[in-house]
Each structure stands twice: as structure tokens, then as C-alpha cells.
Amino acid sequence: MDLTDTQQAILALIAERIETDGVPPSQTEIARAFGFKGVRAAQYHLEALEQAGAIRRVPGQARGIRLAGAAAHARAAPAEEPVRDDVLRLPVLGRVAAGLPIGADIGSDDFVVLDRVFFSPSPDYLLKVQGDSMRDEGIFNGDLIGVHRTRDARSGQIVVARIDEEITVKLLKIGKDRIRLLPRNPDYAPIEVLPDQDFAIEGLYCGLLRPNR
């Protein structure tokens, strides 16, 4: 997949910011740097870069852009112990709001090894819950939830969703002319997705792990 001049320039900006600042730019910063009217245009180009294999994006992080391909392989990766077929080795990628949406900006290189039986479908990563808006679904503050990476979800499923650059876990409700994200705690109000917001499904909730605390 060939990159456009704009996409090549965005890739160069990402590499430069990682090199100079140690962190990638946010979608808002990319939009501002290239004169886009909003983050939707930046999101479009980032999706193209990801499809081309030039970057990968880490769900659950506001600055979750990572270089891929030759640039990524230049960094030495730590050796990993083999994992049995009946267990999962899952990365803990950040935090997700079970409350008001938050910028999910806490990265982690931690991994958790656990039995596959805890999850259905099989998760791709874990996120740490912050808040209690999903209390009545048995999801509590501090839980680690498994997330199955997908862009597709049905009304009535619990999803991890991104609104602009914020991440939240909620019950998805798709109406005739609107999308809402519903809490499972009467102390919280539903979130209605507005037409001008950058909204995407990051994955499906597929189980949880409750650390000892």
C-alpha cells in the first residue's frame, strides 16, 4: 500500500517526536500540525498508516502510536518464556474509564499469564478499570478486563469505545438515529455520541481478572 505525501509527512512527524520527546504526538497535535479541521482527518491518515504496516496503535492509550516495520524491529525485544497452549500471556496496555471517559494515557509493559477459561472470546489485551459505572455488571474499580480487539459490535454488548481521544467501557446501545454508551450504575448518566465526535469501537469486553487488593 503506497502512502500519500501527507501520510509520509505524518509518519516523519511521529518518528521525529518519538526521537526528540520520547513520546508520539496525539491525534489533536497531528491535526494542528497539518492544519486539519479536526481529529477525524488525522484518524483517517493514521488508519492508513496502520493498514500499511508503518505504525501500530495501542488501545487504551491517548498517545498510543508506535512505529512498526523496520523502525520497530531495530529495538531489541526481551526474550519471552514459552507459554502453554491452555494459558494466555496478555499485555496490560493501560486504563479504561468505568465512569466518565478519561484519556487513557498510562502505558505499561506488564504481562499477566492466566488460564484461557476466564475469557470468552479470547482477549488480545487487558485494561485496568478506573471507576464504578459498570458496577451492576460486576465490573469494579481496579479490575483488569479482557478486551477482544474488533471494530464490530452489536447493540447490547459491553464494549471498550473511544470518543475522540478518550477511552471508556460501557454497554453499547444502537438506536435508529443515535448511538449511546450506557453505564450500569444509576449514579451515572448515559453518554450520547455526537455526530461531530471521533467515535470508534476498540474491542469487546470478554471477562475480567480481579487482582488481590
UniProtKB/Swiss-Prot annotation:
DNA-binding region extent: 27-47
Pfam families given in the database record: LexA_DNA_bind (PF01726), Peptidase_S24 (PF00717)
CDD domains documented for this protein: S24_LexA-like (cd06529)
EC number: 3.4.21.88
GO molecular function, one term: DNA binding
A Gene Ontology BP annotation from the UniProt entry: proteolysis
Stored InterPro entries: LexA (IPR006200), LexA-like (IPR039418), LexA/Signal_pep-like_sf (IPR036286), LexA_DNA-bd_dom (IPR006199), LexA_repressor (IPR050077), Peptidase_S24_LexA (IPR006197), Peptidase_S24_S26A/B/C (IPR015927), WH-like_DNA-bd_sf (IPR036388)
Site-annotated residues for Cleavage: 98-99
Keyword annotations from UniProtKB, A to Z: Autocatalytic cleavage, DNA damage, DNA repair, DNA replication, DNA-binding, Hydrolase, Repressor, SOS response, Transcription, Transcription regulation
Active site: 133, 170
Reaction catalyzed: Hydrolysis of Ala-|-Gly bond in repressor LexA
SUPFAM superfamilies linked: LexA/Signal peptidase (SSF51306), Winged helix' DNA-binding domain (SSF46785)
Protein's UniProt keywords contain Secreted: no
Known partners and oligomeric status: Homodimer.
Family membership: Belongs to the peptidase S24 family.
Record function comment: Represses a number of genes involved in the response to DNA damage (SOS response), including recA and lexA. In the presence of single-stranded DNA, RecA interacts with LexA causing an autocatalytic cleavage which disrupts the DNA-binding part of LexA, leading to derepression of the SOS regulon and eventually DNA repair.
Full protein name: LexA repressor
The encoding gene: lexA
